[in-house]
Amino acid sequence: MAFTLQAEAAEAPQPLFSGEVSSSAVQAMHPFPEHEQYQAGTIKPNYVSQNQLDDEVRKKYNEWKTRYLKKHPKKSDQYYVFYNLEKEAAPDNAVSCSEGHGYGMLISALMAGYDPQAKDYFDGLYRFYKAHPSVNNPALMAWQQIKTGAGDIIDTPPSNSDDGSRSATDGDMDIAYALLLADKQWGSSGPIDYLSEGKAAIAAIMKEDVNQQKWSLKFGDWVENNDPDYGLATRPSDFMLSHLRAFGNAAGDPNWAKVADNTYGIIQTISTKYSPTTGLLPDFVVWSNGGYAPSPPNLLETDRDGYFSWNAARVPWRVPVDYLLSGDTRALNQTKLTNAWISKKTNGNPSKIVAGYKLNGDPLDDNDPAIAYSAPFAVSAMLDSSNQNWLNTLWKSIVNAPTSSNSYYGNSIRLLCMITISGNWWDPTDASN
């Protein structure tokens, strides 16, 4: 089925505040659009031109930035990603989390060259990250911030039901990867040594977020290795294999390959044993009876913890990126299986993708489509040329979904997936970069 798209020219990025003057004088060395050469045989949407793909990214970036990227109300040199605009997070006065902060730092580094203020935003986000260190390791970020009645932004205190003073692995990993991108984008000879900061974050992740008994990724720096519930548990949405590869390259640490090997092993175990017809991974995985298994209900969040739900929705984006960039085939079968299943399940109609599934493919929420699910499936569709019509349909669906009709989570994931699908995600540790 062919589609036509009348792509409007993206508006130039606008300052967040009237009269704001960019201090960035450093030229981007990898300006958007980067047009990375992905693994041979992978595909992009082909019913539109490359310029139209890039232009859709520009437009969604402008909308995302205007909606979510905010200047600190009391510290003009800091920025944060306002992840609670739609009031979906608790407590009500929550304003920032390390997950969203990592997204913001990735996006700012990747959109440099298009947005002349990208370095200003990145540096402001960096300063906010450094102003909110985890209580367990200052190279990692406290996972949640709230705004007080006086207008100050502080870490959610331990007295709250959710202790925001400790780290979460996904935010830690994205922040570290973003710092590596920044080093290649602007160099590290300026006021911020991005490379040294990135290496410090990588070392902290290895020390605090990795259980080195199994070389598994933990939920965050708050998990003790010997914790009977969480010590060997892991979260598949943290399975950022290309990040792990980059961390090993940047740090010169072969232990990152052990983490990647174990992570690929978990993907293989779960998809073969628990989701052989769908390839779906659950929100959380535990070590049980000598092997990895889907989490029981309410391990960490909800009764959906053992299903493909709001956390695991990111897996079809996170995992395939390693194949796109490196050609590692270890998750290829699982990714292709999941993509073939969802395409057949929906009869090729992205609007029928719902917000969560049991591992056998039964839907959790009928009639509840969500961009946070459909956008990652578009990334996984890139891995096989037989998916061309399906990828075209997915791309049309995700670019046409209004930003105003979606929340921070879906809009952020959508933008990062669009950057990837358009050929503009890259590895800062690749020698060619």
Where are these regions (language model features)?
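Alpha-helical support elements that line or immediately flank enzyme active sites
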Residues: 105-114, 381
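Extended ligand-binding clefts on enzyme/binding-domain cores
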Residues: 19-67, 71, 94-98, 131-143, ...
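Outer membrane beta-barrel
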Residues: 119-127, 133, 168-178, 186, ...
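C-terminal functional modules
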Residues: 351-433
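C-terminal segment of classical bacterial N-terminal signal peptides
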Residues: 1-8
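Aromatic-rich carbohydrate-recognition surfaces in CAZymes
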Residues: 93-104, 156-186
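Short coil/turn linking the two alpha-helices of tandem helical-hairpin repeats
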Residues: 112-113, 183-187, 248, 323, ...
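Asp/Glu-centered strand-loop micro-motifs enriched in Gly/Pro and often flanked by an aromatic residue
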Residues: 70-96
